[in-house]
Swiss-Prot record:
Lineage, highest ranks first: Archaea, Thermoproteota, Thermoprotei, Thermoproteales, Thermoproteaceae
Organism: Caldivirga maquilingensis (strain ATCC 700844 / DSM 13496 / JCM 10307 / IC-167)
InterPro entries registered for this protein in UniProt: Metallo-B-lactamas, RibonucZ/Hydroxyglut_hydro, UPF0173, UPF0173_UPF0282_UlaG_hydrolase
Family under the similarity heading: Belongs to the UPF0173 family.
Protein name, as recorded: UPF0173 metal-dependent hydrolase Cmaq_1073
One GO MF term: hydrolase activity
SUPFAM superfamilies: Metallo-hydrolase/oxidoreductase (SSF56281)
Tree of life domain: Archaea
Keywords: Hydrolase
Disulphides: none
PANTHER family the record matches: UPF0173 METAL-DEPENDENT HYDROLASE MJ1163, UPF0173 METAL-DEPENDENT HYDROLASE MJ1163-RELATED
NCBIfam families: PRK00685.1
Amino acid sequence: MGYLKWLGHAAFEVELMGKRILIDPWISNPNSPVTLGELSKVDFILVTHDHSDHLGEAVQIANKTNATVVSIFELAVYLAEKEGVKNTIGMNIGGPVKLTNEIEVYMTPALHSSTHGSPVGFVIKSPEAVIYHAGDTGLFSDMELIGRLYKPDVALLPIGGYFTMSPREAAYAVSLINPRAVVPMHYNTFPQIRQDPEEFRNLTESLAPHVRVYVMKPGDVLNLPIK
C-alpha cells in the first residue's frame, strides 16, 4: 500500500510501489512536520520550478540520499553543473519518463514564473495511484484535458491566491480535472497566502460534489489507493 504525506506548503512525500518520492521539498518551511535529518531514504525528487519555496532543500537531500532529481531540462542542467547533483533527469512538458518499470511521470504546463526553464506540474502514474501535483499555477482551461488524459486519483492544488489560484479558482479547477479526491496546498505559509481551506471545501462541494476533499494538516497521511 502506498501513501501521500503532506509536509507543508507544496511539499509532499509519496510512496508508490515501494519507492519514496519527494515533491517540491522545502523541508525548512515553517509548517514542516519533519527535519532534513529524518529524511534518510529518498529515491526520487520532483521539482516543479526553481523558486526557493519549491526547490527547497532538494540539493542537500539528493546529495545525502543519492536520490534522482526530476525537473524541467534547464533546471536539471543547473543542478548538475552548478550545484553538483549527481543524478538528474531533465525532461520537458509531455512524457512519459519511466522512473521504474512501474512508475512513470508526465510533465504538465503551469501558469507561473521560473528562472531556469518553464514552471510545470507533474502527473505520477503507477498501478497503486495516479497523482497530479499542479505546481504553482493559475487556472487554465487545459486542466480539463489533464483530467481526461491522465484520470488522476488525487489532485494536489494550490489555493493560497496572490501567487497561485485562490480557493474559488482552485475549486473550479477541480470541476475541470475531475479527480477522485483533491488535497489543497500552498496556503497559510506566510501572510500573503492566508486562506481558509474550508472555503475551498465548500466551493468544491458545490461545483464538484462527487470529488472528495481532504483538508490535511502537515504530517497527515493519505493512504493509497483511494478507497
